Curated annotation (Swiss-Prot):
Protein name: Light-harvesting protein B-800/820 beta-1 chain
Organism: Rhodoblastus acidophilus (Rhodopseudomonas acidophila)
Subunit structure: The core complex is formed by different alpha and beta chains, binding bacteriochlorophyll molecules, and arranged most probably in tetrameric structures disposed around the reaction center. The non-pigmented gamma chains may constitute additional components.
SUPFAM superfamilies found in the cross-reference section: Light-harvesting complex subunits
Cytoplasmic-side positions: 2-16
Membrane topology, Periplasmic segments: 40-44
One Gene Ontology biological process: photosynthesis, light reaction
Family of this protein: Belongs to the antenna complex beta subunit family.
Topology term for the membrane: Single-pass type II membrane protein
Gene: puc1B
GO molecular function, one term: metal ion binding
Length: 44
């Protein structure tokens, strides 16, 4: 465990990376779902 809590600046930087990662994950997942829907006949 960390001995000291994050500063506000450190927390904001970490939050930015977490949100950017979540956005990238959602974008890739949405793209994969569109591909799966368009390329697989059993989903239509």
């Amino acid at each position: 465990m960390a001995d000291k809590p994050l500063t506000a600046d450190q927390a904001e930087e970490l939050h930015k990376y977490v949100i950017d990662g979540a956005r990238a994950f959602v974008a890739i997942a949405a793209f994969a779902h569109v591909l799966a829907y368009s390329l697989t006949p059993w989903l239509h």
